[in-house]
């Protein structure tokens, strides 16, 4: 008997960072679904690098033991999820795709999501990852709250 296909979640850096640094919440619940292998985390290298930079900045403001624990929690999460890695998009493609999204820094993230074709792209950045962007790219873009509301209707 084959196991059911897992929902593939492409996580933007704000969801991933929020889930790591927050003691609870939907970001952390999203990471828990991935760690439990209920969902499959799709992790773009561009997102991973941004998260690691953000975590190091966050860790600098913490007591030494807490900072060490934060970094260890992140490493453990990456091991547990066995994330599907998405390489950086080609620089020429990034330049030529600038029209797809309002903020230039989001182009590599968007292209990585398009290349990986996840079931969902989860982000809190609804100012840039708009419904128009979703229509242009054929991506299902939502906040973690929207994802969980949809999930609850499927299970209920």
Predicted regions and their residues:
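PIN-domain endoribonuclease scaffold, especially VapC-family toxins
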Residues: 35-94
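Short, flexible helix/strand-to-coil boundary loops that buttress conserved ligand/catalytic motifs
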Residues: 20-21, 55, 133
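Active-site neighborhoods of divalent-metal-dependent phosphate/nucleic-acid chemistry enzymes
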Residues: 79-120
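Short secondary-structure boundary segments
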Residues: 13, 45, 124-126
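Acidic, PIN/NYN-like endoribonuclease modules and their adjacent C-terminal/linker elements
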Residues: 107, 111-114, 119-120, 126-156
